[in-house]
From Swiss-Prot:
Top-rank lineage group of the source organism: Eukaryota
Cytoplasmic side: 48-55, 122-140, 219-238, 294-313
Stated name of the protein: Olfactory receptor 5D18
GO process terms (BP): G protein-coupled receptor signaling pathway; sensory perception of smell
Gene Ontology molecular function terms on file: G protein-coupled receptor activity; odorant binding; olfactory receptor activity
Localization per Swiss-Prot or TrEMBL: Cell membrane
SUPFAM superfamilies: Family A G protein-coupled receptor-like
Membrane-spanning ranges: 27-47, 56-76, 101-121, 141-161, 198-218, 239-259, 273-293
Length: 313
């Protein structure tokens, strides 16, 4: 059924965001603006560093550049609107705008989840079968894995978005959140949302279980391989290689699991908002910091660039 047939084309929503704390609007704006600026500079900077340094043209850094791009994208989908709503009184968003925001946000979050799983598999091949690493992780395979992650992200998002377009809304629609979350739309709809809820549950469960299964299986083999190494320096190097990725995975999946384990009650809305801020705004900022601060190649490239700029003047 077409969108106009459901009388939703002119529907608007009000995003409450953090309006419960009017005295914190300006401080929150300044904090989130700083975080978003660091996110943009960090992720774009990491992509540029990987691009200009031939030493970083490896599968691991190829996946890392894609992760930085995804982090930049899904943060940019949420943060600007959230920042605007912190300083203006009119916090409305059209139904179409809400659906578009959800579509792109869902696409990039699902893509990130599978990219992290792909990166775990890459570490598994590099540590457990290093002699055949360049053969097994060919450029063609790397591109296919990334394209597959994006394609699945778009597919999941399309299914949920199409189901949202069939919903009907009436009256005053207030979303007690700072972005258009799918479950929030379902709670406001006057349509039967049974199928939508099951579709959301199925896709979320499948994505989380499948990606975590890949990650846990990969790292189980990695741990066994590392423990079999006789060289202490070899063990230390292997653990160091995986530390950044494990940190990123723990923060990302830990936050999402915590978020969806919180009971959907009025008393938990504050907790849900805080957790949502963490994985929509904070995590995209942390990822480039996590990977660059613990990575000698990245730090060396940054040092070379800075030295070149200094001596050029």
């Amino acid at each position: 059924m077409l969108l106009t047939d459901r009388n939703t084309s002119g529907t608007t929503f009000t995003l409450l965001g953090f309006s419960d704390y009017p005295e914190l609007q300006v401080p929150l704006f300044l904090v989130f603006l700083a975080i978003y600026n660091v996110t943009v500079l960090g992720n774009i900077g990491l992509i540029v560093i990987i691009k200009i340094n031939p030493k970083l043209h490896t599968p691991m850094y190829f996946f890392l550049s894609q992760l930085s791009f995804v982090d930049f994208c899904y943060s940019s989908i949420i943060a600007p609107k959230m920042l605007v709503n912190l300083v203006v009184k009119d916090r409305t968003i059209s139904f179409l705008g809400c659906v578009v925001q959800f579509f792109f946000f869902c696409t990039f979050v699902v893509t990130e989840s599978f990219l992290l799983a792909v990166m775990a598999y890459d570490r598994f091949v590099a540590i457990c079968n290093p002699l055949l690493y360049t053969v097994n992780m060919s450029q063609k395979l790397c591109v296919l894995l990334v394209v597959g992650s994006y394609a699945w992200g778009v597919s999941c998002s399309l299914e949920l978005t199409c189901s949202a377009l069939k919903l009907c809304f009436h009256g005053f629609n207030t979303i007690n959140h700072f972005f258009c979350e799918f479950s929030s739309l379902l709670s406001l709809s006057c349509s039967d949302t049974y199928i939508n809820q099951w579709l959301l549950f199925f896709l979320a469960t499948f994505n989380e279980i499948s990606t975590l299964l890949i990650v846990l299986t990969s790292y189980a083999f990695i741990v066994v391989t590392i423990l079999k190494m006789r060289s202490v320096s070899g063990r230390r190097k292997a653990f160091s290689t995986c530390a950044s990725h494990l940190t990123a995975i723990t923060i990302f999946h830990g936050t999402i699991l915590f978020l969806y384990c919180v009971p959907n009650s009025k008393n938990s809305r504050h907790t849900v908002k805080v957790a949502s801020v963490f994985y929509t705004v904070v995590i995209p900022m942390l990822n480039p910091l996590i990977y660059s601060l613990r990575n000698k190649d990245v730090k060396d490239t940054v040092t070379e660039i800075l030295d070149t700029k200094v001596f050029s003047y």
